[in-house]
A protein has these predicted regions:
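Short, small-residue-biased leader/transition segments that mark boundaries at the very start
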Residues: 2-9, 176-180
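Conserved alpha/beta-domain cores
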Residues: 10-171, 175
């Protein structure tokens, strides 16, 4: 193909190496096909905004204690492992920089009445409970608020789950490079 031959010419003469932002296995595969030599930033929070993943994330956010969070995180772990496996496989040994969960938790919950009612129905709780939780998660300045390492310090089980997903796959890859 024309794109393929252009890439071969580029690879022969360029010194520039491009790393991309990729948050899904599909993004990583597309980036690799366009010549990316790694992922400069994989934002794990972008992995959670669809289907069953968002439900499990919301369950974790609504959990009242560490045990409840661990139960929800046990549902999230296989999703994380599958996403990381796909990303690592697509990158075929190229470097991947992973950022652990960073955004404020309020980004994972609906702010409109219809979405909150759907969440309440799905979770088996009252609309008022959801509204109270959503309000309690809002911050005046979320860019400096409860996110990143502060979130990890408050809820270390989140960091533990993500670390388990990443390192578990890394260990598999080291021992059996073709298994990923």
């Amino acid at each position: 193909s024309l794109v393929g031959s252009e890439m071969c010419i580029r690879d022969r003469y360029t010194r520039l190496q491009v790393r991309t932002n990729a948050d899904t296995p599909h993004d990583a595969e597309v980036a690799r096909n366009f010549g990316a030599v790694g992922i400069g930033l994989c934002r794990t929070e972008h992995m959670f905004f669809e289907g069953e993943k968002i439900k499990a994330m919301r369950e974790m956010i609504l959990a009242e204690d560490a045990e409840g969070r661990r139960k929800a995180l046990a549902k999230i772990l296989p999703y994380q492992q599958a996403d990381f496996k796909g990303i690592f496989k697509a990158m075929a040994g190229c470097p991947v920089t992973v950022r652990l969960l960073d955004p404020p938790l309020h980004e994972f919950v609906p702010h409109d009445l219809k979405g909150q009612q759907e969440m309440a129905d799905t979770m088996g709780v009252s609309l008022q409970y959801i509204q109270q939780r959503v309000e309690s998660l809002c911050e005046h300045n979320p860019m400096l608020g409860h996110r990143g390492c502060r979130l990890g310090n408050t809820y270390p089980e989140i960091t533990q789950m993500q670390t388990r997903a990443i390192l578990g796959l890394s260990l598999i890859h080291i021992s059996e490079p073709t298994r990923l």
